[in-house]
């Protein structure tokens, strides 16, 4: 196989408006998409974990969208460094692209994986995708971080009013996917079972946004977007949600 770029899905489980995927698909190489079920994380989870079920369903949805290009998302189980060590023996990989992950474990993992790849002549690139602003982008005037939420939120809204949201049309470049059949894993293969917990369905409802300031304190009301889990796993673009919400001019919802 000719030189290829790997796109490593993590908390960005969608093909549309995906910054890292867009940069991978426009890199000039064919792109090999994959997801690693990290044993360091999943071995601590209950057998009927709804989060794993949601991730697995999202990967199946991505594969369904990619199949017209004769491609699928590879599902791998193991420690990321070991998985990449194996992949380097099978494919001519010259670059691995992914999106930033901010959790302490993820930061350490990415540092180790990045060093391993670079020591083997493979570039490792990460992009901002999961947030509108990173921690260094919204700080006090003296450059130090905020410790109180209210002044932070004011600065965030001020910065947002001065910023135009980027859009990354990754969905328009799927013809750059590598035509390679990669392994698929079932929940059972991963050591899990169906949770029977209904997956939340998010909604873009202008009424919910407009009335959020009044309704947010009444959980019995059906007045939320249900976007939380989708933002957590990236099945919904935060830029897409924020752009839509900003049209309704309700800063409380944006907070």
Regions found by a protein language model. Name each.
Residues 1-160:
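Trp/Phe/Arg-rich N-terminal binding region typifying the photolyase-homology
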Residues 148-255:
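Glycine/tryptophan-enriched, flexible segments
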């Amino acid at each position: 196989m000719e030189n290829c770029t790997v796109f490593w899905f993590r908390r960005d489980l969608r093909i549309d408006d995906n910054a890292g995927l867009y940069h991978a698909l426009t890199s000039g190489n064919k792109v090999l998409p994959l997801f690693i079920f990290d044993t360091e994380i999943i071995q601590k989870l209950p057998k009927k974990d709804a989060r794993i079920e949601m991730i697995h369903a999202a990967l199946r949805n991505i594969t369904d969208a990619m199949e017209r290009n004769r491609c699928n998302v590879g599902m791998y189980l193991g420690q990321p460094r070991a998985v990449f060590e194996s992949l380097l023996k099978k494919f001519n990989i010259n670059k691995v692209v992914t999106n930033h992950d901010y959790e302490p474990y993820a930061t350490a993992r990415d540092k180790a994986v990045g060093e391993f790849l670079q020591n083997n002549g493979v570039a490792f690139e990460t992009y901002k995708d999961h947030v509108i602003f990173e921690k260094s982008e919204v700080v006090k005037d003296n450059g130090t971080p905020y410790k109180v939420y209210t002044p932070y939120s004011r600065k965030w809204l001020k910065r947002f009013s001065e910023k135009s949201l980027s859009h990354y049309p990754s969905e328009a470049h799927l013809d750059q996917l590598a035509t390679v059949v990669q392994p698929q894993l079932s929940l059972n293969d991963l050591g899990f079972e169906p949770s029977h917990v209904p997956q939340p369905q998010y909604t873009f409802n202008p009424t919910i946004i407009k009335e959020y300031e009044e309704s947010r304190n009444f959980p019995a009301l059906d007045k939320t977007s249900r976007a939380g889990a989708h933002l957590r796993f990236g099945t919904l673009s935060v830029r897409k949600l924020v752009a839509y919400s900003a049209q309704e001019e309700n800063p409380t919802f944006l907070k």
